[in-house]
Curated annotation (Swiss-Prot):
CDD domains: proteasome_beta_type_7. The keyword Hydrolase applies. The proteasome degrades poly-ubiquitinated proteins in the cytoplasm and in the nucleus. It is essential for the regulated turnover of proteins and for the removal of misfolded proteins. The proteasome is a multicatalytic proteinase complex that is characterized by its ability to cleave peptides with Arg, Phe, Tyr, Leu, and Glu adjacent to the leaving group at neutral or slightly basic pH. It has an ATP-dependent proteolytic activity. The side chain of Thr-30 acts as a nucleophile, and the N-terminal amino group acts as a proton acceptor. The keyword Transit peptide does not apply. Its EC number is 3.4.25.1. Its main location: cytoplasm. The active site is at T30 (nucleophile). It comes from the Eukaryota. Belongs to the peptidase T1B family. It comes from Saccharomyces cerevisiae (strain ATCC 204508 / S288c) (Baker's yeast). GO terms for biological process: proteasomal ubiquitin-independent protein catabolic process; proteasome-mediated ubiquitin-dependent protein catabolic process. This is Proteasome subunit beta type-2. One of its GO terms (molecular function) is threonine-type endopeptidase activity.
Length: 261
């Protein structure tokens, strides 16, 4: 019978009434972007890795190699993005050897979306896949459930709103390589300054037609830790003692035992 199904809604209400709390969604805590230009494509990412409210890693690499000319940026669960990109990278290499031709970006896209769809979102990997092949330059985004998108500029992660604001206001047709790198870097910095889940440095990867990818690790370091201008160690006695109280929390008893007998 055609129509809407409210089975899941009724199930969720039943579980809530029986003290079963709904699972909380994991924040992607990242800013990643991709921008196409005249002769290729650029992807960029921040380098902050978080564990809840804690910064777990200040210089985490979020740009992953799939093949010499195909790279992807990952947001979501770090272990998932690392594992899934390594798996697809291996499969792409085997596919390239079997077909005796340069791997296509759409092949990596198809492998990724089929793998993620199979697990129904339980693999928390949100990816921007970019690369060049004999058919040209390509830029795609993939969500954890397997849905995909294509565009001239894309952004994912918790800082994607700030990044997309920069991309939409500054993108133009026929960008040069330098302009695309600057636009992607500015978009990542917008995420760094406006999203608590993003921070530290900016990584960039440039893929041009006819060339292998150029990985620019720590392309920008807007959060360099400066040296303190003076010492903040204070000598003992700087803070006055207003009151002193000594409490005996145990009694010490001494007993001598003669062991000569």
């Amino acid at each position: 019978m055609a129509g809407l199904s409210f089975d899941n809604y009724q199930r969720n209400n039943f579980l809530a009434e029986n003290s079963h709390t709904q699972p909380k969604a994991t924040s992607t805590g990242t800013t990643i972007v991709g921008v196409k230009f005249n002769n290729g494509v650029v992807i960029a990412a921040d380098t902050r890795s978080t564990q809840g409210p804690i910064v777990a890693d200040k210089n985490c690499a979020k740009l992953h190699r799939i093949s010499p000319k195909i790279w992807c940026a990952g947001a979501g669960t770090a272990a998932d993005t690392e594992a899934v990109t390594q798996l697809i990278g291996s499969n792409i290499e085997l596919h390239s050897l079997y077909t005796s031709r340069e791997p296509r970006v759409v092949s990596a896209l198809q492998m990724l979306k089929q793998h993620l769809f199979k697990y129904q979102g339980h693999i928390g990997a949100y990816l921007i896949v970019a690369g060049v092949d004999p058919t040209g330059s390509h830029l795609f985004s993939i969500h954890a459930h397997g849905s995909t998108d294509v565009g001239y500029y894309l952004s994912l992660g918790s800082g994607s709103l700030a990044a997309m604001a920069v991309l939409e206001s500054h993108w133009k047709q026929d960008l040069t390589k330098e302009e695309a790198i600057k636009l992607a870097s500015d978009a990542i910095q917008a995420g760094i300054w406006n999203d608590l889940g993003s921070g530290s440095n900016v990584d960039v990867c440039v893929m041009e037609i006819g060339k292998d990818a150029e990985y620019l690790r720590n392309y920008l370091t807007p959060n360099v830790r400066e040296e303190k201008q003076k010492s903040y160690k204070f000598p003992r006695g700087t803070t006055a003692v207003l009151k002193e109280s000594i409490v005996n929390i145990c009694d010490i008893q001494e007993e001598q035992v003669d062991i000569t007998a």
